């Protein structure tokens, strides 16, 4: 194995977020309120299964232990199960997860698990069916809930649920969410609304700090857990009376970037050092043949020298990210 990916600030990178499409069939208010619109940049197509196999093999050789498949909506790819299996071929990758809107969970989750999937994150921004419809543009609440049940039936011991925290939309519904996870092994992750190039007005209207929830959880006796090295950025809390957990993802908090352990590759093969960074490093020309792996690893390692110490969201600089479907949120 080549040396562990490490940047100029001594951060080690064990976690790859790999977008496999930017297409999504939902129209979430904070991401794609007007629905998916194809970009000219994707005309040459999304990464193939072989390209995905090669890029994940290179990252694994550089110390990556966890791969999360993102989008867009990953399950819209007809070869999604094949993609999971291709990543699973590499024993160095211990965890393969997906972030999904849950649209196809009920139908396909057992097949995904058989192919090697080890973790699931489902986006659910409200437990009220009408509000869910209003946020996502899809009347699929019951279908998504059935999908979460199907994930447990397929053998997943825990399901993570992502909820974008929005003032005057769901921030006052903590008790409803806590009741939902009291007897279910769900890690409910509240994610602070983040400003994107297309979402400034929404951000100004609905952003609320996750610290409000953290203070309330601590007041109620929830206990802060320690992070593992390949975990995502959530601060996780548990409570002896609850089967579920609460996670808080607060990108505007001081020192959020200090524990960064993840890199991103877009659905067209660009390496992004930060969700809110500029540009990206093209890897696709080195994904054509297995013989290019050494050069691919060298390019990834060299690019990491340019990773900044922090994002610049506090300065209203959202970088290249126009919406969160672009490089996988």
From Swiss-Prot:
Amino-acid positions noted as binding [4Fe-4S] cluster 2 in the UniProt annotation, renumbered to this chain: 257, 260, 274
The EC designation for this entry is 4.1.99.22
Q: Which family is this protein grouped under? A: Belongs to the radical SAM superfamily. MoaA family.
Tell me, in a sentence or two, what this protein's role is.
Catalyzes the cyclization of GTP to (8S)-3',8-cyclo-7,8-dihydroguanosine 5'-triphosphate.
Q: What gene makes this protein?
A: moaA
Tell me where in this chain the Radical SAM core domain is found: 8-234
SUPFAM superfamilies, A to Z:
Radical SAM enzymes
Q: How is the cofactor bound?
A: Binds 2 [4Fe-4S] clusters. Binds 1 [4Fe-4S] cluster coordinated with 3 cysteines and an exchangeable S-adenosyl-L-methionine and 1 [4Fe-4S] cluster coordinated with 3 cysteines and the GTP-derived substrate.
Cofactor requirements of the protein? [4Fe-4S] cluster
Identify this protein by name. GTP 3',8-cyclase
Assembly, in brief, is:
Monomer and homodimer.
Please list the residues that bind [4Fe-4S] cluster 1.
24, 28, 31
């Amino acid at each position: 194995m080549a040396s562990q990916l490490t940047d100029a600030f001594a951060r080690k990178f064990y976690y790859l977020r790999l977008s496999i499409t930017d297409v999504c069939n939902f129209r979430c208010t904070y991401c794609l309120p007007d629905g998916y619109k194809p970009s000219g940049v994707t005309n040459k197509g999304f990464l193939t299964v072989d390209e995905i196999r090669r890029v994940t093999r290179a990252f694994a050789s550089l110390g990556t232990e966890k791969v999360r498949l993102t989008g867009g909506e990953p399950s819209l790819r007809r070869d999604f199960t094949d993609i999971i299996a291709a990543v699973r071929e590499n024993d160095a990758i211990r965890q393969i997860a997906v972030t999904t809107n849950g649209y196809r969970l009920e139908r396909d989750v057992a097949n995904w698990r058989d192919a090697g999937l080890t973790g699931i994150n489902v986006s659910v921004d409200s437990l009220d069916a009408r509000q869910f419809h209003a946020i996502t543009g899809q009347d699929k609440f019951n279908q998504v809930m059935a999908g979460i049940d199907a994930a447990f039936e397929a053998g997943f011991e825990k399901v993570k649920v992502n909820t974008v925290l929005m003032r005057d939309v769901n921030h006052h519904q903590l008790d409803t969410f806590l009741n939902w996870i009291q007897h279910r092994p769900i890690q409910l992750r509240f994610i602070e609304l983040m400003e994107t190039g297309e979402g400034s007005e929404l951000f100004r209207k609905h952003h609320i700090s996750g610290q409000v929830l953290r203070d309330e959880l601590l007041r109620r006796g929830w206990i802060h857990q320690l992070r593992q090295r390949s975990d995502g950025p959530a601060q996780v809390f548990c409570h002896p009376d609850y089967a579920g957990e609460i996670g808080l993802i607060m990108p505007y908090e001081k020192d959020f970037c200090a524990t960064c352990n993840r890199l991103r590759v877009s659905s067209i093969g660009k390496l992004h050092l930060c969700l809110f960074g500029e540009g990206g490093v093209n890897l696709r020309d080195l994904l054509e043949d297995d013989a290019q792996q050494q050069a691919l690893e060298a390019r990834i390692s060299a690019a990491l020298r340019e990773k900044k110490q922090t994002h610049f969201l506090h300065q209203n600089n959202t970088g290249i990210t126009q919406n969160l479907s672009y490089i996988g949120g």
